[in-house]
Amino acid sequence: MKTKAAVAWKAGAPLTIEEVDLAGPGEGEVLIEVKATGICHTDYYTLSGADPEGIFPAILGHEGAGVVVETGAGVTSVKKYDHVIPLYTPECRQCKYCLSRKTNLCQAIRSTQGKGLMPDSTSRFSIGGKVIYHYMGTSTFSNYIVVPEIAVAKIREDAPFDKACYVGCGVTTGVGAVIFSAKVEAGANVVVFGLGGIGLNVIQGARMVGANKIIGVDINPRRIGIARKFGMTDFVNPNEVENLVGHLIQLTDGGADYSFECIGNVTTMRQALECCHKGWGQSYIIGVAAAGEEISTRPFQLVTGREWKGSAFGGARGRTDVPKIVDWYMDGKLNIDDLITHTLPLERINEGFDLMKLGESIRSVVLY
């Protein structure tokens, strides 16, 4: 079949709208009509050429929602017309990682997904016989996609696609880090570094669980208003305090119980750890640093009880937890509407990247 898609032909170049050939679903695969997709910073990271795993030409996008059009042989968990979110972190429920119950990082299809291919080591996309690679196993910048069944989360049908798509990455990454990774308890003091889309979702996750102080750290004072709306209690601009770590420790009566780094900067990663409370403070790295970067701190910070951890896709198990997060939104527990600042047709997708680079959007959504 034919599908319209925004193709990344090479790093650093704008996406171009193309008619792409899409092979139908094979055994254990699902054909989805994507109705909406967010434009995430990870897409920009890959498009910029900074991503060492970036492969071109490819169809980017990993934050989508849509409808099942067709299923391949053996598919049992979804059927035609189901509303779904494609998952860049699948959940096979059978691999060593899934069975451990210690992680959400299913590895069932990781080796081929990282090469821009389906589990059978082929691509479903092509133009004039030339292979176009998949991206993060999802490629939601295409109106139609084929994904493995283990990478499809069925969601309720009354959830609007233009909001549900954001659960495919940003909402889950932030809210999930609080609820599934850190398991923040009521009354805890939380510090959030970076008030972009991920940071704001961390903040509303902390508010959901009843955190005490929720302190936002950012150099952009324009974020104060929306961060307070999502639950931030205090704002700190690092450029306006002499000793950021000391200031945060003072604000939290000895240090944060939990901190979250949502920027991808190794300097703020260190600050996020060192502002944690002696004896029990936990710092979670969510932001992705540039290739080759390394983190450092004095070992004594860890010896004296602080913990340095990471969170990917919010620690959420895709097929199990993503539908719950959509329910939280539909039940009014989560605010997604105010995070969607721009909606665009596919033909204007490059404008969405420009808005992100200029810091003028929280999340732009492409509607098909």
Regions found by a protein language model. Name each.
Residues M1, G254, R270-E274, R319-Y368:
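C-terminal hydrophobic helical "lid"/dimerization subdomain
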Residues L195-G196, V288:
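Glycine-rich Rossmann-fold phosphate-binding loop(s) that bind the pyrophosphate
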Residues C276-K278:
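Helix-to-beta-strand junctions that scaffold the AdoMet/dcAdoMet cofactor pocket
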Residues G199-L200:
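N-terminal Rossmann-fold NAD(P) dinucleotide-binding loop
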Residues A23-T37, A50-L99, N104, T112, ...:
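Glycine-rich beta-strand-centered segment in the early N-terminal region that forms part
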Residues L22, Q94-F193, L334:
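NAD(P)H dinucleotide-binding glycine-rich loop of Rossmann-like/cofactor-binding domains
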Residues Q282-Y284, S296-D338:
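Rossmann-fold dehydrogenase core element
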Residues V192-L195, R207-Q271:
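Adenosine-nucleotide cofactor-binding segment
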